[in-house]
Amino acid sequence: MAKRIIYNENARRALEKGIDILAEAVAVTLGPKGRNVVLEKKFGAPQIINDGVTIAKEIELEDHIENTGVALIRQAASKTNDAAGDGTTTATVLAHAVVKEGLRNVAAGANAILLKRGIDKATNFLVEQIKSHARPVEDSKSIAQVGAISAGNDFEVGQMIADAMDKVGKEGVISLEEGKSMTTELEVTEGMRFDKGYISPYFATDTERMEAVFDEPFILITDKKIGLVQDLVPVLEQVARAGRPLVIIAEDIEKEALATLVVNRLRGVLNVAAVKAPGFGDRRKAMLEDIAVLTGGQLITEDAGLKLDTTKLDQLGKARRITITKDNTTIVAEGNEAAVKARVDQIRRQIEETESSYDKEKLQERLAKLSGGVAVVKVGAATETEMKDRKLRLEDAINATKAAVEEGIVPGGGTTLAHLAPQLEEWATANLSGEELTGAQIVARALTAPLKRIAENAGLNGAVISERVKELPFDEGYDASNNQFVNMFTAGIVDPAKVTRSALQNAASIAAMVLTTECIVVDKPEPKEKAPAGAGGGMGDFDY
């Protein structure tokens, strides 16, 4: 494939063109008065979106070089999304502003490498400043504010996420499902929940709701397939004497053993239910061990030299309550805090050590199941298009609240970055010189871009608003939805520090790369050759 090679100013200008196109498409969504973007889908209805990274992923340009610019800026958005889960539009607007400002200097003959060094130093200074200004999230009101701002000023959603976090803890899982009704609802399960239900419907204790509910049961946890009922008899006899129900969690229970359990259950001899173990392979064993720790029992496995037929009552787990439906099992246990805490710390260490994002996600799920329970938000909407938009907004809101809990909150609405601009200029003048100083000043000038854009989307003059904000104290800024200057914390317009920091770092990193570009190599589009004129009657329009 032949290549096109473009050098110097031409290369940078071509990248800039692509960056302009993407930044403009994404920037229209910024702020409380930001508009939506409609995306055409190859199949199904068009999607109406207000989420920066989703829009960025859809944009592909015909010109290969301009498309390279789009791909670079898209990276700033998706990296921010990966790190903080929100702030993608801010990252795009910032990167665009730094590139525009920087290219002017490079065109005027500045040394791009020194500019990059200045940009990097400025970014490090700003990250420290953001950390020092961040306030820890103390109460559910702050969490609700962060969630509401991220979901596009939907305070009902913010409150719902705050309630969910209250119930499942800061590390609990909040998952999203498409609901069946018009309203968005929150469903919380306390304790540990995994997605395997009873093996046979005959185990249901409540036939109307088709669920099995046991109070104060014993739990037999094993990674074996149970084929012979003789293996179970010693345990069943001990449990029957104790007069408490039994829940068996095993890899599988085969026909003969299952039939015996069902018959005993129906005759009222023994209150019992059997559930298949969750997960697969090594992960299954780890999850069974988690359940054993949670319930204060032992995993009966031949790896540890333990056999079913010699199992004693004190090796079984105990729970306050177990609810089993056809699809999932919820265990509410208590009294094993020390063991659970040790197990949680162990999983946390594994999360830190693992490189794979898939493993990280699965470990995070295990951590959440152990440490807090699960909240499910069922997203409701009138149409599928609205449902998809709400789901994306909710996802942003959940990510933003988790980020806020991690690193605290700062004034929102572009205010923090705008206030840091004069501080950066002051610091840079005192500590940097020459073109490094110019690099830091490029960042300082770009910092007001998100605030300007929020004001412009609200129909006002961005430059005037940003100058006014710079004169105010740090906690005060511009409330675009009510068109007034307010204390951002009091008004509840806050951003997670992690989101602001990630957006800034990723924007500066990508922009610095664009400024130091001196040559672009892209594929040359191949002209399609038409068939020769005499290629059969009426066949000349086909490509060969």
Swiss-Prot record:
Domain of life the protein comes from: Bacteria
Cellular component per GO, a single term: cytoplasm
Record GO terms (molecular function): ATP binding; ATP-dependent protein folding chaperone; isomerase activity; unfolded protein binding
Cytoplasm in keyword set: yes
Keyword Chaperone: yes
InterPro entries recorded: Chaperonin_Cpn60_CS (IPR018370), Cpn60/GroEL (IPR001844), Cpn60/GroEL/TCP-1 (IPR002423), GroEL-like_apical_dom_sf (IPR027409), GROEL-like_equatorial_sf (IPR027413), TCP-1-like_intermed_sf (IPR027410)
UniProt GO BP: protein refolding
Keywords: ATP-binding, Chaperone, Cytoplasm, Isomerase, Nucleotide-binding
Chief location: cytoplasm
PROSITE patterns named in the record: CHAPERONINS_CPN60
Reactions accelerated catalytically: ATP + H2O + a folded polypeptide = ADP + phosphate + an unfolded polypeptide
Top EC category: isomerase
Residues annotated for ATP binding in this entry: T29, L30, G31, P32, D86, G87, T88, T89, T90, G413, D495
A Pfam family it matches: Cpn60_TCP1
EC number(s) on file: 5.6.1.7
Gene3D superfamilies with a match to the protein in the record: GroEL (3.50.7.10), GroEL-like equatorial domain (1.10.560.10), TCP-1-like chaperonin intermediate domain (3.30.260.10)
Compartments, as annotated in UniProt: Cytoplasm
HAMAP family per record: CH60
Subunit organization: Forms a cylinder of 14 subunits composed of two heptameric rings stacked back-to-back. Interacts with the co-chaperonin GroES.
The family this protein is said to belong to: Belongs to the chaperonin (HSP60) family.
Function, in words: Together with its co-chaperonin GroES, plays an essential role in assisting protein folding. The GroEL-GroES system forms a nano-cage that allows encapsulation of the non-native substrate proteins and provides a physical environment optimized to promote and accelerate protein folding.
Cross-referenced PANTHER family: 60 KDA HEAT SHOCK PROTEIN, MITOCHONDRIAL (PTHR45633)
Name of this chain's protein: Chaperonin GroEL
